Regions:
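Juxtamembrane inter-helical linkers in multi-pass membrane proteins
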Residues: 52, 185, 193, 280-296, ...
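Juxtamembrane helix-boundary/capping and inter-helix hinge elements in multi-pass membrane proteins
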Residues: 66, 101-104, 177-182, 192-195, ...
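Helix-loop-helix hairpin linking two adjacent transmembrane segments in secondary transporters
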Residues: 240-265
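A short amphipathic helical element positioned immediately N-terminal to and/or at the very start
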Residues: 8-13, 56-64, 338-347
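Glycine-rich helix-loop "coupling/hinge" segments at transmembrane-helix boundaries
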Residues: 49, 225-249, 334-335, 496-523, ...
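Transmembrane alpha-helical segments of polytopic membrane transport and secretion proteins
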Residues: 1-26, 274-310, 545-563
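Membrane-water interface segments at the C-terminal ends of transmembrane alpha-helices
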Residues: 17-51, 65-177, 205-225, 257-274, ...
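The alpha-helix within a helix-turn-helix
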Residues: 187-188, 458
Length: 563
């Protein structure tokens, strides 16, 4: 009997001691296989088969040798690289200003930086049209220019940089805060200038975080569907072209091949970010407290960084303020009289897509949040058969573009025994399994900071794994739980690229309705939908915050009442 087989039997024996845990793991493995791996494999198989069912790579080779497809591929790569470089530079300066200087208004700057992340899609695209389109407030209203073409790559770069630089900021602010400042303080005491310290100490220590942030922004740029679809014009990108070929030409095979072309760089970037960059760290950890670190106070450093943060916050406010104004005018640039007709339309004829989106998000959010924490708990605290497979399957959807997921679901669930297309179930499944990776990552990070002896004490007193997780672990990781819930709700409300292939007449959602309004140039109706979505999302975040903060408090009060 080999050691590996003995280990297998030992793990199986441990699992069988807790039948409910064993059944839970089996159920999770089944659903991850069904809703993540199966659609992914189905799409790969479909793209690599001929009409008579024979496996071949010639279809994929022909896609890469097609001049039009190749141009579209390099357009997406070029947009992703430029956005990643500019967005990471801005994100780094923004993070450095907030974490390393004593400038004012930091809470305001932090709040503004998170706004593009939790906002509906199309906001920045719509604001660019309102400001710089043919009837734009700036182009036509201020300068009288009527032939300015706002569509194309340049506008896309601006929009994507403003949309995704907050991702780089959040990543890099954590990196900068974790760097021990004692080395920098020592260099300063020895007479080194701030510039010398930055270029020889701070920047080199930040390199792993910079590369990680750049890859994350690159992935987001590649996977972005809404902005290229609205403002791309003749600048073709893979995700949008895939959608147009499938819905316009009814050619699922060609659309799938384009999605495979999009998948490859996205998956490579994800693997690099997760397994290569994360393994490289140059951060110094001395064990000394760093909370009272000295902040940079030199005016020639603080003032330019303050101006930079203020500029980008002003641009964000301008964009969002423009959309808000656009929701209250009849026809932007033509008839700017104030009206509430767009909101009357939403809450009468156009209410169903909004109700559907909220309903589906309310159902999917707690499922995704709880599943994320359970999978994180199992991955960190338990040792069982299929653990690595569960980890890979649960995190894979983060690397998959929405168009890839949508096409995979069409192919996987369009026939018996898993006929789900056109139902609410398929949309809920997309929302749940597309959004759990962030909750899992947050839960794993939180669990890594908790001493396992706390849970071991609960187990030794007779509690099973479920009781320990519910009463001990979950209240301790409620911060990660809250983040997972918020992310899931926001992404469920704002999803476009995956659900646009899966909606039906009964189950249309607000984002696809907004997209259809863009196609017929009903921009003020779209703006009104966006304003309502922002209000709904903010209200949901507030409610989730209250609900998660009460986690564990009611139980403690009940225990005190029994004494």
């Amino acid at each position: 009997m080999t050691n590996r087989f003995k280990e297998f039997l030992w793990k199986l024996k441990l699992l069988l001691k807790e039948p409910l845990l064993f059944l839970l793991i089996l159920a999770l493995l089944f659903f991850l296989t069904l809703f993540v791996i199966f659609p992914f494999v189905k799409m790969l198989y479909y793209s690599l088969t001929t009409e008579d069912g024979k496996l071949t790579v010639s279809t994929l080779v022909s896609a890469f040798t097609n001049k039009s497809y190749r141009t579209t591929f390099f357009n997406s790569m070029k947009l992703g690289v430029i956005t990643a470089i500019i967005g990471t530079i801005i994100g780094y300066m923004y993070a450095y200003a907030i974490t390393r200087t004593n400038m004012r208004w930091k809470p305001f700057f932090k709040t503004m930086a998170t706004l593009p992340i939790i906002s509906p899609p199309f906001v920045l695209s719509l604001s660019i049209i309102f400001l710089f389109g043919r009837k734009g407030l700036i182009t036509n209203g201020l300068f009288g220019i009527t032939n300015f073409d706002v569509y194309g790559m340049k506008s896309l770069i601006v929009i994507q940089v403003m949309s995704f630089f907050p991702i780089a900021y959040l990543t890099l602010s954590g990196i900068l805060e974790s760097i021990d400042t004692s080395v920098e303080d020592a260099a300063l005491n020895l007479g080194a200038s701030r510039l010398k310290i930055f270029t020889t100490i701070t920047l080199p220590l930040s390199i792993p975080g910079i590369v990680s942030a750049m890859l994350l922004v690159f992935i987001q740029s590649l996977q972005d569907f809404s902005n290229p679809a609205v403002i791309g014009g003749d600048f073709a990108t893979l995700g949008v072209e895939s959608y147009r070929i499938i819905t316009g030409l009814y050619d699922l095979k060609r659309g799938t091949l384009l999605s495979i072309m999009l998948l490859m760089p996205s998956l490579i970037a994800f693997l690099l970010q997760r397994y290569w960059v994360r393994g490289k760290s140059f951060i110094t950890v001395t064990g000394k407290p760093t909370q009272n670190r000295g902040k940079i106070a030199e005016k020639h450093i603080v003032y330019p960084l303050f101006a930079l943060c203020l500029f980008f916050c002003a641009v964000i406010l301008l964009f969002y303020g423009t959309v808000l104004c656009g929701a209250f005018v009849k026809v932007w640039g033509v008839d700017n009289s104030i009206t509430l007709n767009h909101f009357r339309y939403i809450f009468s004829i156009g209410i169903r897509p909004l109700k559907n989106a909220v309903t589906l998000a309310i159902i999917a959010t707690p499922i995704a949040g709880i599943l994320g924490m359970i999978i994180a708990f199992l991955t960190v605290r338990k040792d069982f058969i299929g653990k690595k497979y569960m980890s890979l399957a649960s995190l894979l959807t983060f690397a998959l573009p929405g168009t890839v997921i949508g096409i995979g679901y069409i192919l996987a669930f369009n026939a018996k025994p898993f006929l789900l297309t056109g139902t609410a179930v398929i949309l809920i499944a997309v929302f749940v399994f597309r959004n759990i990776p962030v909750g899992i990552e947050g839960g794993m990070s939180a669990l890594a900071q908790i001493d396992p002896s706390i849970e071991e004490a609960s187990t030794s007193l007779g509690a099973n794994s479920f009781q320990t997780f519910k009463d001990i672990t979950l209240p301790l990781i409620k911060g990660a739980f809250f983040s997972g819930l918020v992310y899931s709700f926001v992404r469920s409300m704002t999803a476009v690229s995956a659900v646009i292939f899966l909606i039906s007449a009964r189950w249309n959602v607000v984002t696809t309705r907004i997209f259809s309004l863009f196609e017929v140039s009903q921009y003020s109706d779209a703006a009104a939908y966006i304003v309502v979505m922002i209000i709904v999302i903010m209200a949901a975040v507030f409610i989730l915050d209250r609900a998660v903060n009460s986690l564990g408090k009611n139980r403690q009060k009940a225990k005190r009442g029994k004494r």
